[in-house]
């Protein structure tokens, strides 16, 4: 039997049930626009000023997050789809299509005499091909530039012909001006660049830069929140929680740190589910269209066995963000695990993979279905793909060894040895390593005989 996935089956089942319920005709009005935001090309600037390209992207992301009709694709998915950090227009077009965006925000920054010019562009991905619109450049002295960019997110939204009230525009502009201290914003942007690297060194550099941003501007709530996010990525739960709480005190109306606290509570060994529900609910109170907070709320209620409450939360999450591949992955789990519906499960997993080809959870689920149905060739392909994406994915290495036992004992021996070498130093893999060694001894004896 293959190893069970690391995600809670109950949560996955609830999400699947939600999608079944939602399939009856939930429609999102007004129409949602799915967008990606790329760092602006600042390669023509001096090296010490090239952080500004990320700075513009941050302003856009912070601003449009305030609009209920804009769904933003995470930067990590965009980078994975692109396969590079250099997002030229052709690369951006291909990557945006891959993540199912229908628009992309991008552009460049150039020097014009003593001023800087931000030259924004909008790409709409239509069936006939990409259509690029050039927006009015914003030209200003360096010290004044980022203060003038607060109107840019609204310009993008209205160029997309998305209805925007005066109150929404004011909320967007306020969010797009997260600090009035230029040096603090520079440190914040540099910190984001480091954090996007996703490795230990990058996160540690981000902690230093974001800490300095908060020192320069103690009221910079977004920097305080992001410092907590990076601490969480480094496994520093207590420091992360302290930063999130500090952010809620700096600005009690800012929902992101409440959602982040919910994530921390939900993942605590002490099972702080009630506190998670409270934190997610507060985030939703502050931003009623906060899709990720609804997902967290659904997870927390499912963990409390409040199935009806979980379904209602997931329903809201789908209304505000219907392009989440996790939905289809969860459908695959419930189709096969609960109902034994093989074809429906395979189709659901394939849909999740179509939306996010690098989803190791969906590929693991599909591989497990194939394996249990005796389709060892197909299972092998999925587990190998997971290992290509994440060479240290112990679950895929373990399951691949099990499949090889059915078809090629010698290959299984080699795979078990690779798994044991990788997993032995990991405390979380101890029991699995013990089982693997038993399999390995048995196989070696069989091959001898």
Q: What kind of feature is each model-predicted range?
A:
Residues 30-94, 104-116, 124-138, 173-177:
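Short beta-strand->alpha-helix linker/helix-N-cap micro-motif
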Residues 184, 221-222, 255-256, 291-292, ...:
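Helix-start (N-cap) detector for alpha-helical repeat units in TPR-like alpha-solenoids
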Residues 195, 232, 259, 266-268, ...:
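Position-specific recognition of the canonical hydrophobic site in helix A of tetratricopeptide repeat
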Residues 201-208, 233-246, 267-282, 303-316, ...:
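Structural signature of tandem alpha-helical TPR/SEL1-like repeats
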Residues 406, 410-449:
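Terminal, low-structured helical/coil segments at or just beyond the last alpha-helical repeat
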């Amino acid at each position: 039997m293959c190893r069970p996935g690391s995600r809670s089956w109950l949560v996955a089942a609830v999400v699947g049930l939600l999608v079944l319920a939602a399939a009856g005709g939930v429609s999102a009005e007004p129409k949602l626009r799915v967008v990606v935001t790329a760092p602006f090309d600042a390669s023509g600037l001096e090296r010490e000023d090239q952080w500004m390209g990320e700075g513009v992207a941050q302003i856009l992301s912070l601003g449009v997050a305030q609009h209920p009709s804009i769904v933003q694709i995470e930067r990590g998915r965009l980078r994975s789809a692109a396969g590079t950090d250099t997002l030229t227009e052709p690369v951006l077009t291909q990557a945006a299509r891959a993540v199912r965006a229908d628009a992309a925000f991008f552009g460049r920054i150039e020097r014009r005499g003593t001023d800087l010019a931000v030259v924004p562009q909008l790409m709409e991905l239509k069936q006939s091909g990409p259509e690029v619109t050039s927006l009015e450049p914003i030209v200003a002295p360096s010290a004044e530039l980022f203060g003038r960019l607060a109107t840019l997110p609204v310009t993008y939204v209205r160029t997309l012909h998305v209805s925007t009230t005066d109150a929404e525009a004011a909320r967007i502009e306020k969010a797009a001006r997260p600090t009035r201290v230029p040096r603090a914003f520079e440190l914040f942007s540099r910190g984001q660049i480091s954090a996007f690297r996703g490795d230990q060194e990058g996160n540690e550099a981000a902690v230093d830069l974001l800490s300095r941003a908060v020192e320069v501007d103690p009221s910079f709530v977004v920097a305080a929140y992001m410092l907590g996010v990076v601490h969480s990525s480094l496994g520093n739960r207590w420091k992360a929680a302290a930063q999130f709480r500090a952010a809620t005190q700096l600005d009690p109306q800012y929902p992101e740190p409440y959602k982040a606290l919910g994530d921390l509570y939900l993942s605590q060994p002490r099972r702080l589910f009630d506190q998670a529900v409270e934190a997610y609910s507060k985030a939703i109170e502050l931003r009623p269209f906060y899709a990720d907070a609804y997902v967290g709320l659904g997870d927390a209620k499912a963990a409390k066995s409040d199935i009806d409450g979980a379904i209602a939360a997931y329903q809201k999450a789908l209304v505000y963000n219907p392009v989440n591949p996790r939905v289809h992955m969860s459908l695959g789990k419930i189709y096969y695990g609960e109902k034994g519906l093989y074809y429906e499960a395979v189709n659901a997993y394939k849909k999740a993979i179509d939306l996010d080809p690098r989803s190791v959870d969906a590929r693991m689920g599909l591989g497990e279905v194939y394996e249990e149905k005796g389709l060892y060739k197909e299972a092998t392909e999925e587990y190998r793909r997971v290992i290509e994406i994440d060479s240290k994915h112990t679950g895929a290495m373990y399951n691949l060894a099990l499949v090889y036992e059915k078809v090629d004992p010698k290959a299984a021996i080699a795979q078990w040895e690779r798994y044991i070498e990788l997993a032995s130093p990991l405390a979380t893999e101890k029991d699995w390593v013990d089982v693997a060694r038993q399999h390995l001894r048995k196989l070696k004896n069989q091959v001898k005989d």
